[in-house]
Amino acid sequence: GKVRRFAGQTPNSIDQRGDFPSMSDDFLRFLPLMRENCYICAEVIQIHVIMIDTQLYEYMMEMLRKTPTGFHRYLYQDIPWEAQLVGITGARGIGKSTMIRQYILGNQDKGRFLYVSADHTYFADHRLSDLADEFVKDGGTHLFIDEVHKYSDWSRELKQIYDVHSDLHVVFTGSSILDIEDGAADLSRRALVYPMSGLSFREYLKLFHKVDSPTYSLEEILAGKGEVTGIEHPLPYFREYLRKGYYPFSGEIGFEMRLQQVVSRTIESDIAQH
């Protein structure tokens, strides 16, 4: 339910309407702390403001805890994160979700950010637009919606959010290219949509072999100026990249099984619906 916690208190000691506690024993015990330390009081008030729903907050914190931070995809620096509406599209498993969570982790004002997945059970009986309304009322500034195509009528509600909340920054991702393309047509005047591919060879070398190779223009490559620095014989690495280097999870245990799952879900869920 909608519960906002004070530092060091449990949900049972908080008014279940989501407001500050009534004049109860718990609240009276809290008053000396407010008088003693205004800084702590300010921190508590901030916690009150940013927490919309316990299950969504806990889900976001768990996802952020699992997010690796040592490597960023090439697209990370190109995304205008402060634009009003941004979409990131691409195949399953290439790192879209990781990239937006990395941005949240790297932002000092992440207390006003909310990360949700459109297939979360919360949306079984809640509307996306209602969540945005409440989030803005609670002081939220950045809403990140993962796998947005899992939410029916997502493009219409994103248009509504865009038109109603001009100060809210929304970033959404989608893996179902067909669904995203259909919805993006409705959002063409509003959303900046960035396609994301799998790892490039340069990214593969940096992620798995710690080789940071510079980029070269086509003219430089044709002029023979481009070379893979840090590796004396790059061809074996390139063959390895062609075999399994497209996905960031290729170095994990069970890569083949997970790759098969990605292919199956793409065929059975994304393509079959069309």
Task: Give the ranges of each region predicted by the language model.
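Pre-Walker A adenine-sensing motif
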Residues: 63-81
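Conserved lysine of the Walker
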Residues: 96-97
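Structural recognition of the conserved hydrophobic beta-strand(s) that form the central parallel beta-sheet
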Residues: 169-175
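Hydrophobic anchor at the beta1->P-loop junction of P-loop NTPases
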Residues: 88
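Interdomain hinge/linker elements that couple catalytic modules in large macromolecular machines
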Residues: 35-36, 42-61, 206-274
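Short glycine-rich substrate-engagement loop in P-loop NTPases that contacts/grips substrate
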Residues: 111-139
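Short regulatory helix/loop adjacent to the ATP-binding pocket of P-loop NTPases
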Residues: 178-193, 208-209
